[in-house]
Regions:
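Extracellular adhesion/carbohydrate-recognition regions
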Residues: 22-107, 198-265, 269-273, 324, ...
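Short aromatic-cysteine micro-motif
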Residues: 50-183, 187, 256, 263, ...
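Short low-complexity stretches enriched in small and charged residues
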Residues: 18-26, 140-144, 311-320
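Short secondary-structure boundary/capping segments
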Residues: 124-129, 195, 204-207
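Charged, compositionally biased non-catalytic regions
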Residues: 1-18
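Amphipathic alpha-helical scaffolding segments
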Residues: 117-118, 194-198
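C-terminal, surface-exposed recognition/capping segments
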Residues: 1-4, 150-160, 167, 174-177, ...
Length: 369
């Protein structure tokens, strides 16, 4: 470990026991938040005691994962870092962000959709879905709270990106200083391990994508489709037409998971996440996978503090194109549609924007345990 960071690490651990300074192959630090393992029944209405997929890597359970406390700032060394009060790096495609995180060493990776979903579901269950920079420097529901703007970065004279982690406490995932910041707005965040292929949902099983030796590439053999009848994972046919697998259909002004697509369009269409449904062709096991990956609401989850509107977050998608990869969270102009359940499956992996970035994560691979 780089000894000149010892005092800093001790200070971080003392103030926030769930936070730590993690060091990469260059002995450079990032601040990450530990998310301990939990079961599906801990965050969903199900009675299933199965471990959430974010805590299973290469067939083995892990104690938890380290989620970047801040959106990624990438340096000239070709590495992505999680640090406070920085300008989040933008304007790069998915594979570029994957390269930046993978270069840090074994266990480092761009955040996976499974990991993002685990944090989002925890927030939902505990009634603390975070606010953020979704309205030009502030949250659309707030009037006075603001974060520190990135100097020289504006959108038609208004605040665009803000410095990482400089917003008020409600902008952290748990409403505390030790939480994860900016999952609502600021910049969209690329996630790995999930995609649409001509509307067919494909995943890299569990959190295997966290092992950066497993390819997240377009032609990777790790991709699997989900059998709608029983939730089993099968090799896709490559055309998005695998028989009996879960696919994304658009019906009645909302998204619906089904085994067939009656309304397929190579364009971006949006709807509220809370209105996403599953057709009768999708069995309970497959629906549980969808809910665990924050791809549809758990309508049976009710009670004090539970926001059954899921923040009125938006779900955008293109269910006809060859490959569409996920970005999560929204950006500085997404308004009330931004949030931890905001999902955009409209973009190819080659896309880049000034409002699109990433976030790093780390797991201790089971073989190293």
């Amino acid at each position: 470990m780089a000894t000149n960071f010892d005092a800093t690490r001790l200070a971080v651990q003392t103030a926030f026991p769930t936070n730590d300074l993690l060091f990469d192959d260059k002995e450079m630090p990032s601040i990450h938040v530990f998310i301990p393992k939990f079961r599906l029944c801990d965050v969903l209405s199900t009675q299933s005691t199965e471990t959430h997929p974010a805590f299973i890597v290469n067939g083995k359970e892990i104690d938890g994962f380290w989620f970047g406390k801040y959106q990624s700032t990438c340096t000239d060394s070709g590495r992505a870092y999680s640090l406070p009060a920085e300008d989040p790096t933008v304007s790069h495609n998915l594979d570029w962000f994957v390269t930046q995180t993978n270069a840090k060493g074994a266990g480092w990776h761009e955040i996976s959709n499974a990991e993002w979903a685990a944090v989002a579901l925890w927030c939902h269950k505990h009634g603390c879905e975070p606010k953020g920079n979704n309205n030009y420097g502030k949250d659309s529901s707030e009037t006075y709270y603001e974060a520190i703007p990135v100097p020289g970065v504006q959108d038609n004279g208004k605040t665009a990106r803000v410095r990482t982690g400089t917003g008020p406490l409600p902008w952290s995932h748990n409403g505390r200083m030790d939480g994860i910041w900016d999952m609502n707005g600021n910049v969209w965040e690329w996630c790995i391990g999930l995609r649409l292929v001509k509307g067919e949902l494909q995943i890299i099983p569990n959190n295997n994508a966290a092992d950066n030796s497993v390819s997240n590439g377009a032609s990777s053999s790790a991709w699997r489709a989900i059998k709608a009848s029983d939730g089993s994972l099968v090799a896709p046919d490559g055309n998005g037409t695998t028989t009996g697998t879960v696919k994304l259909n658009y019906t009645g002004g909302h998204w619906e998971w089904d085994t067939t697509i009656s309304d397929s369009k190579d364009e971006s269409r949006g709807a509220l996440f809370k209105n996403t449904t599953a057709a009768s062709s999708v069995g309970d096991a497959a629906k549980l996978i969808l809910m665990s990956l924050a791809l549809m609401p758990d309508t049976a989850m009710t009670g004090d503090g539970i926001d059954t509107t899921y923040g009125n977050d938006n779900f955008w998608a293109n269910n006809a194109a060859d490959e569409r990869c996920p970005i999560r969270g929204g950006c500085w102009f997404s308004g009330g549609g931004a949030g931890v359940f905001s999902l955009n499956l409209n973009n190819p992996r080659s896309s880049s924007w000034t409002n699109g970035g990433g976030r790093s994560a780390f797991v201790k691979l089971p073989a190293e345990a």
